[in-house]
Amino acid sequence: VVHDRLNVEIFRGCTRGCRFCQAGMVTRPVRERPREQIVSMVEKGLKRTGYDEVSLTSLSSADFSGIENVISEVMTQDSCSPVSLSLPSLRVDAFTVDTASQMQQARRTGLTFAPEAGTWRLRQVINKLISDDDLFAAVESAYSQGWRRVKLYFLIGLPTETDEDTLGIVDLAEKTLEIGRKYHKSPSVTVSVGGFVPKPGTPFQWFGQNTEQELLRKIYLLRDAAKKIRGLKLKWHDSRATVVEGILSRGDRRLAPVLEKVWKEGGVFQEWSEHFDIDLWKNAMEEEELLIEDFSYRHRDENEVLPWDHLSAGLHKDFLWQDWRDALNNLGLEDCRWTPCYDCGACTGYGIEHVVASAVPPAGGSQGTGAVSQQGNEITVSISQTGTAKDLQVSGVNE
């Protein structure tokens, strides 16, 4: 009912390396669908469903190699007129003038960009290597092509975050509105803020989550700064729900009776705000003699055995730890689709590799612009003689 549109998945996986993103870490490598197959799926899907909106889905749709060609071919199909086209999960450094120009042929919907953090320094920490200028160029492309509504998504409670980083969210939104006013009388910007919850299998799995009170303080800081700006709307996620999400995110088997107690006390549809009751969770934790601090708020050290260590999505734990240390030093890693392998384990551990529809990177770069870590990965290569030396070719040995 919510997603009342045709959804076509254009690729799986993501190698941008955002350190907060579990999906981007555990679904590596990138596997792109052939362009011709995507166009065919859209055409057939529209004919069979009667939908008038198409969403080209992935973890970062504008990163699809040759995305402008895909949009162009989709929009020239007879079955796609008049149809609205959306690209969810847009990275601002991959949204170009060409992309905006192609999309403006369709019926316009709002555009959502995810800078995630309010300052360049903090975006280096989380490896979301997009500059302020990247954001401003993207929104200028959108506003100049006729869009009036832009939504920006951010996280608060990220590692090393300061009040300056938090207030940078409002500063970016205000400058985005200024760009919009160059093209429209009443542009609008909606800022959506969520509390950061560390996830297993990511470099931030060792980080101690912000408390409910600290998240609330940052929300009030944003609210007070945003209320005087015309055209800016601020939304935020319930910090109490973020507490429960943190418990469940890095919990272990001891939470099984907690879940059962919450359910027995009527805790159903807890993801719905009108049904959510944090007291059910706090009471159940107390009855089981468990502390929220132990699950959510404390930092872990390198040698701690984590509840999910026996599970593997391919990434080496030592790679994640080094990436965590790089984060604390504001060091970024570029997209490994277009750079040498970092030996994270996702590909080398399974003998697989990236599958891209085009050998040319997206026009937006997809390369990253941050300070790149000089930390390499040591690989030991063993060579042994298993046959008669006379059978070896000189060229083979040299290679």
Model-derived features with residue positions:
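Glycine- and acidic
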Residues: 3-8, 19-29, 51-59, 118-125, ...
